[in-house]
A protein has these predicted regions:
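Short, compositionally biased P/S/T/A/G/V-rich stretches that sit at domain boundaries
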Residues: 1-25
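N-terminal substrate-binding region of glycoside hydrolase catalytic domains
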Residues: 30-32, 52-64, 69-218, 222-237, ...
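Solvent-exposed loop/turn segments flanking beta-strands in beta-repeat/beta-sandwich domains
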Residues: 38-51
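Aromatic-rich peripheral "rim/lid" segments of glycoside hydrolase catalytic domains that contact
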Residues: 103-106, 117-124, 171-180, 217, ...
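Structural preference for beta-strand elements that scaffold enzyme active sites
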Residues: 131-136, 149-153, 214-217, 259-263, ...
Length: 459
């Protein structure tokens, strides 16, 4: 999966102690590396190869873009072309007639230097709403880059209708071979074939240049196969395929608007540690594990400023009275999943933001990565007052966490047990958020829940 040729013997991409690829200007790419010693080779020469996102080894017949006598600090400059925005540069030696990579291939890590449509970021309230400030961006439906409405956040989606932009391991023809089938709702995008890369890059470049969107979310709850379908392989391969798409999307977007932000999206499953063999092991990977693997893969090929979009729904979605689970089937189990940190809701958002403060998860500048809560709806199934109190609590959770930049409410969902539409008290509470009336409903919500301080229910 993703590997197009067989790796040579003793392939060691970790040989180099560092490597990077950056734009010096709009015409020149600088590639540098640091080696611990001169590598053994057939000819004493270092070769630089251009590689596609889906290539993880270099064919013996590949033609290098540059070469130089071996040294401890090799440095190359190569011309920038539009296609090199989406390819990697790999450092290799000849060994036994094979091209052996001695460093992790590197993408251009500063695509924003190319941006010609950079826009100042808009002042954003903490609270926003799906359908008003947020839209789903279905690929191949916006090929001209024109989006009606003045949205600021878009979630990039693939409904599977266009097989060219759908990952080869997500297409209808291969689904019967899935050893652990799920019911797909959306599909992995295709950064494993040239045509898919070109289509994705072209469309997202136009949208980034021509729309008001400044936050782009690549996929919906991508730690769950239902929402980003690919046949079962293993989680490392799955995340690698997603990472390839994310890179293409990131460079397409940031090379147009340097102030745009690009996010990976996870759901509530945080640290459940389902073992192999458990049915759920094949359905989702914990958000924490997904981010750890994704971050390592991205950093190895040139760290970039990705962010996290999380969906902090209550657990379960069908029950909004989170402070009293006595009326919820399996309420004790559900409450324990949250209190133990296995599931993440607005009650325990610090799980995510504390994790993102660890050294290995910081952005290239050393900052904590951008965090938005891109979808949450509170059911009215337990009554509008319960819905109103839970709604206010979710807002307080976002407001009190210094790393959460936005919470985006889904207010139009209407299924029998998960109806997030507002009325009466819940509408009044929602309207107050971010206004002078907010304090009035703060007191009401605490009294309704039966607490004196929000720290009693929000961590």
């Amino acid at each position: 999966l993703g590997i197009q040729v067989n790796a040579a013997k003793a392939l060691n991409q970790a040989f180099a102690t560092s490597a990077s690829s950056i734009l010096l200007d709009k015409a020149t790419i600088s590639y540098t590396a640091a080696l611990p010693e001169i590598p053994a080779s057939d000819d004493g020469v270092l070769y630089l190869f251009e590689m596609q996102p889906y290539e993880y080894a270099v064919a013996p017949t590949a033609v290098p873009v540059a070469s130089a006598p071996a040294s401890l600090t090799p440095a190359f400059t190569v011309p920038y072309t539009g296609t090199r925005l989406y390819t990697k540069l790999g450092l290799a030696v000849k060994s036994g007639g094979q091209n052996v990579l001695i460093a992790n291939p590197q993408y251009i890590a500063n695509p924003e230097l190319l941006a010609t449509h950079t826009k100042a970021r808009q002042a954003r309230p903490l609270k926003s709403e799906q359908g008003k400030e947020f839209c789903n961006l279905y690929m191949s439906e916006n090929a001209n880059g024109v989006i009606s409405g003045r949205y600021t956040t878009a979630q990039i989606m693939n409904n599977g209708g266009n097989q060219a932009i759908t990952n080869p391991y997500s297409r209808a023809a291969i689904m019967p071979t899935d050893t652990h089938p799920v019911a797909p709702q959306h599909y992995m995008l295709n950064a494993s074939e040239p045509a898919g890369i070109t289509a994705i890059a072209s469309e997202l470049s136009r949208v980034a240049a021509n729309s008001t969107i400044e936050n782009f979310i690549v996929g919906n709850e991508v730690n769950v196969r239902t929402w980003n379908y690919m046949i079962w392989t293993d989680w490392d391969s799955y995340i690698r395929e997603y990472m390839q798409t994310f890179r293409v999307a990131y460079n397409a977007i940031r090379s147009q608007n340097a102030n745009a932000r690009v996010f990976v999206c996870i759901d509530q499953n945080w640290d459940r540690n389902r073992p192999a063999g458990h049915a759920e092991y094949y359905e989702y990977i914990d958000g924490k594990d997904f981010l750890e693997k994704f971050n390592a893969m991205v950093a190895a090929e040139g760290n970039i400023d990705w962010g996290v979009a999380q969906h902090p729904y209550p657990v379960p979605l069908t029950y909004a009275k989170f402070w009293d689970m006595s009326g919820c089937p399996s309420g004790g189990y559900m409450a324990a999943q949250v209190s133990s940190g296995k599931m993440m809701t607005f009650q325990n958002l610090s799980l995510l933001t504390n994790y993102l403060q660890t050294p290995q998860m910081l952005s290239p500048t050393g900052a904590v990565r951008h965090v938005i809560l891109s979808e949450i709806g509170l059911t009215n199934a337990q009554g509008v007052e319960v819905q109103a109190a839970a709604l206010y609590a979710s807002y307080v959770a976002a407001k009190s966490n210094p790393y959460v930049e936005e919470i985006i409410y889904l207010l139009s969902y209407s299924e029998p047990q998960v109806d997030t539409r507002l009325s009466g008290q819940s509408q009044l509470v929602y309207n107050s958020l971010g206004t002078a009336q907010e304090a009035v409903y703060d007191a009401w919500a605490k009294a309704f829940i039966g607490i004196s301080d929000w720290s009693q229910v929000i961590k």
